[in-house]
């Protein structure tokens, strides 16, 4: 992942001016051998229900106050979706995630990365909803289906 030179400065200023404890920025996805870049725009999330259907927060775009990470609020032991779980846990504490709609990060997507493993994504997606959000099997499968559809729309 690549940051623009002014990312930290602009994002910190955004957080201070808007009183956010955590924020993320827009980012572009750069795929190997592809000329067109896709930009995912950042938006502010006010509660965890807004983020449940699709993780639109790029890990390398996030800036947060250290105090948000605690024994009960940290990355879980998953191969994928660990960042998604953390953002949902933070939102469940009624902490808004600010969205700075400025493209300050480039994410290079590689075909052989963990992010590309469909089976692992499905497994971890189900675990996210069932174990960490404590949804029953049917609700977990429903949200996993919605997450999968939204993921396909991003491609």
Q: Can you name each region flagged by the protein language model?
A:
Residues 1, 29-30, 69, 105:
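Short, solvent-exposed loop/turn segments at secondary-structure junctions
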Residues 2-7, 29, 64, 82, ...:
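Hydrophobic/aromatic residue at the end of a short beta strand that borders the catalytic acidic motif
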Residues 3, 15, 79:
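Glycosyltransferase donor-binding loop in the core domain
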Residues 6-38:
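Conserved donor NDP-sugar-binding/catalytic core segment of glycosyltransferases
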Residues 41-120:
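Conserved nucleotide-sugar donor-binding catalytic segment
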Residues 97, 111-155:
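Non-catalytic, C-terminal membrane-associated alpha-helical segments of glycosyltransferases
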């Amino acid at each position: 992942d690549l940051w623009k030179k002014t990312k930290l400065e602009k994002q910190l200023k955004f957080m201070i001016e808007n009183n956010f404890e955590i924020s993320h920025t827009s980012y572009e996805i750069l795929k190997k051998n592809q000329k067109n870049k896709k930009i995912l725009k950042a938006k502010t999330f006010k509660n965890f229900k807004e983020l449940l259907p699709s993780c639109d927060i790029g890990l390398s775009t996030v800036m947060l106050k250290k105090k948000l990470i605690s024994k009960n609020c940290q990355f879980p032991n998953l191969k994928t979706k660990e960042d998604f779980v953390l953002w949902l846990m933070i939102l469940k504490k009624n902490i808004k995630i600010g969205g700075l709609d400025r493209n300050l990060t480039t994410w290079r997507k590689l075909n052989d990365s963990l992010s590309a493993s469909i089976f692992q994504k499905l497994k971890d997606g189900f675990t996210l909803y069932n174990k960490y959000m404590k949804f029953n099997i049917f609700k977990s499968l429903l949200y996993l289906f919605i997450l999968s559809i939204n993921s396909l729309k991003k491609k």
